[in-house]
C-alpha cells in the first residue's frame, strides 16, 4: 500500500475511530477496579512493541527492548511490525513465534493479519508500547490486542496528533532526543504509575553503547567474499565502498541526486584499489543497475535485491565505507564497525542519525530543514529538495578521503 494511502487512512479513518474507541475505553476503565500499574512481582504476561512504518527503526529500538526484558525477565516480549521487518527482528534475537507480521501492501491482507493477532493475545495480561509517535493505527492496535497498559507519546496541548483517550501512560514527545532515547523512555514507563503526568521524569542517556551489535563469523564473511569473486572474477576486492542511493517511498525527498552519485562514483574509481558495490532492495534493482552501468560497469557491482538481511550485514562487515542517504541502511550498518557517511536533508539527524561511533553526517542545515517530522506524518510540501541538492560531490569526497586516509 502506498505511503500516501496509509496516511489518508490514518487521518480520515483513524481520527473518528480513535475518538470512539477512546470513549469506550474510558467508560470501561471507569467501571473497572483493576490496576494498570505493574511491579516485578506482578508483571505482564506479554510485552508487545509496535512499529509498522520504517524497518530501520526496529534496530534503533533494540536498547528499549533489552530494557523491557531487564525490567520483566519473566514476561514474553513480542513485536508487531510490517512483513518486511521479519528478518531484522530474527537477527535481533526474536523467535519466529514472537514476531507478528501485518501485511501493509493491501487492506484485505492487513485486516486478515489483525484478526490473527487478536486471537494470539486472548485472555492474556498485555502491556503494549507504541514506538511511532502519533501513528493512529499503532495506537489502536494496543486496544485491539486487549492491552491494559498502553504506552506511547501523547500530544497534550499540542495541535494535531489526535489519539483520543487510547493511551494509559503518556509521554511527551521530545524532538531533542534521539529516537533510541525516546524508545528507551517508553520502555522505562512500564513501571510508572498512572498518577504521574507527563512521563518520563528521568534523564535518558545516549544509547550508542547499548545499540544492537551483530557479530558476523569469519566463515560467513569468507563465504560472501567467495561469492563476490565467483560472480565477478574480473573485479579486485581490495577496498570495498558501498553506495546506497535510494530511500523508502515514505520520504523520497531524502534522496541525494542520482547524478551526484554518478559523479562521486567516477571520482572514487580514480583510485585503482577501490571497488564500488551498490546496495538496495529488490524493487530498486533496475534503478541501481542504471547507476552501476553509468558509473563503470567493469568496476561497479549491482548487489541490490541479491542479499538476505544477514548477508547485507555481512557485506557491511567486509566493506570499508558506506555512503548512504538517510534511510534504513544508516541503522543496519550501525550494527557493525563499518564507517558510515550519511547524507541528511529533510529530516534531522538529531532524531534518526546513525548510532555508530564510526559515523559522519553531512547536512546543509537549511532554514527550511527539517521539513518532515512525526507531526506531519513525514509528509512535506517541498517540490525542490535543495537540502540534498546543495550537498556537493566535493563535500562528500572530502569526507570519504578522511575515512580512507587519502
Model regions and ranges:
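Catalytic machinery of carbohydrate-active enzymes
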Residues: 1-406
Amino acid at each position: 500500500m502506498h505511503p500516501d494511502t496509509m496516511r489518508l487512512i490514518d487521518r480520515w479513518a483513524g481520527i473518528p475511530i480513535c475518538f470512539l474507541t477512546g470513549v469506550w475505553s474510558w467508560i470501561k476503565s471507569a467501571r473497572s477496579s483493576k490496576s494498570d500499574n505493574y511491579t516485578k512481582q506482578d508483571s505482564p504476561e506479554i510485552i508487545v512493541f509496535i512499529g509498522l512504518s520504517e524497518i530501520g527503526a526496529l534496530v534503533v529500538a533494540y536498547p528499549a527492548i533489552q530494557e523491557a526484558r531487564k525490567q520483566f525477565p519473566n514476561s514474553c516480549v513480542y513485536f508487531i511490525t510490517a512483513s518486511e521487518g521479519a528478518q531484522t527482528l530474527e537477527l535481533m534475537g526474536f523467535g519466529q513465534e514472537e514476531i507478528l507480521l501485518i501485511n501493509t501492501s493491501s487492506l484485505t491482507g492487513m485486516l486478515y493479519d489483525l484478526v490473527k493477532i487478536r486471537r494470539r493475545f486472548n485472555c492474556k495480561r498485555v502491556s503494549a508500547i507504541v514506538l511511532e509517535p502519533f501513528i493512529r493505527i499503532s495506537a489502536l492496535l494496543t486496544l485491539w490486542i486487549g492491552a491494559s497498559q498502553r504506552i506511547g507519546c501523547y500530544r497534550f496541548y499540542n495541535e494535531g496528533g489526535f489519539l483520543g483517550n487510547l493511551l494509559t501512560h503518556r509521554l511527551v514527545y521530545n524532538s531533542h532526543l534521539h529516537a533510541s532515547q525516546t524508545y528507551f523512555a517508553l520502555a522505562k514507563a512500564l513501571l510508572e504509575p498512572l498518577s504521574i503526568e507527563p512521563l518520563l521524569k528521568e534523564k535518558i542517556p545516549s544509547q550508542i553503547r547499548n545499540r544492537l551489535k551483530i557479530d558476523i563469523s569469519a566463515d560467513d564473511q569468507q563465504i560472501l567474499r567467495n561469492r563476490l569473486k565467483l560472480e565477478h572474477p574480473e573485479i579486485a576486492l581490495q577496498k570495498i565502498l558501498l553506495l546506497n542511493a535510494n530511500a523508502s517511498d515514505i520520504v523520497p525527498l531524502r534522496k541525494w541526486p542520482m547524478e551526484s552519485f554518478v559523479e562521486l562514483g567516477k571520482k572514487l574509481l580514480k583510485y585503482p584499489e577501490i571497488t564500488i558495490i551498490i546496495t538496495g532492495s529488490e524493487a530498486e534493482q533496475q534503478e541501481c543497475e542504471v547507476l552501476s552501468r553509468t558509473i563503470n560497469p567493469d568496476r561497479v557491482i549491482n548487489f541490490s535485491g541479491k542479499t538476505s538481511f544477514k548477508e547485507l550485514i555481512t557485506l557491511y562487515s567486509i566493506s570499508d565505507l558506506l555512503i548512504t542517504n538517510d534511510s534504513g541502511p544508516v541503522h543496519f550498518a550501525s550494527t557493525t564497525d563499518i564507517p558510515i557517511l550519511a547524507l541528511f536533508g529533510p529530516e534531522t539527524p538529531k532524531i534518526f542519525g546513525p548510532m555508530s561511533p564510526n559515523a559522519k553526517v553531512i547536512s546543509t542545515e537549511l532554514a527550511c530543514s527539517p521539513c518532515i517530522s512525526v507531526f506531519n506524518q513525514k509528509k512535506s510540501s517541498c517540490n525542490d529538495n535543495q537540502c540534498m541538492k546543495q550537498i556537493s560531490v566535493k563535500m562528500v569526497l572530502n569526507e570519504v578521503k578522511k575515512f580512507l586516509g587519502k
